[in-house]
């Protein structure tokens, strides 16, 4: 019974990841030219940000998916799907991101806080077999949710339709980067 519940949840996560393909703010940059990229090896073909394993697949992911923050040419974090840098609570235990409005998935549905919560909750799920559980294992409630003792991951909170808070159980110097740059 429990396995069936997790399989349903994993299927929902995979569908959400597939819907993230083409997530963009609506502007398009078509100039009619072709970009040719040379690689010394082939792709594995796993283009899900939750499950890819090679840098070559990541090259494709970086061109298709966006994150709340991204690095600019000077290696500084800049808002991408977020409207601004996250706010940090006085004690450093909560990071709050505000999402841009009007961002749509390739199917036309809007990106909102529920999508962010779903993505990070998926990485904490016991059935998750990808390699990014370290992106959430320092959030409040991770252990309880991962072990099936809680129904939700309390460390990821929807504040409103376009605001998400991440509550850290353990301090992490790289928390803004890890949370902010994950697609």
Predicted regions and their residues:
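Short, low-complexity disordered leader/linker segments with a strong preference
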Residues: 1-35, 76
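Short, well-ordered beta-strand elements
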Residues: 31-41, 94-97, 116-119, 164-166
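Extracytoplasmic
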Residues: 32-34, 63, 80-82, 90-94, ...
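N-terminal lobe/hinge region of extracytoplasmic solute-binding protein
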Residues: 38-90
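Solvent-exposed loop/turn segments at secondary-structure junctions
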Residues: 41-45, 75, 102-104, 123, ...
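Extracytoplasmic/secreted proteins, especially bacterial periplasmic and envelope-associated proteins
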Residues: 59-63, 67, 72, 76, ...
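Aromatic- and charge-enriched surface segment that lines or borders ligand/interaction sites
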Residues: 84-135
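Surface-exposed binding/hinge segments that line
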Residues: 98, 133-183
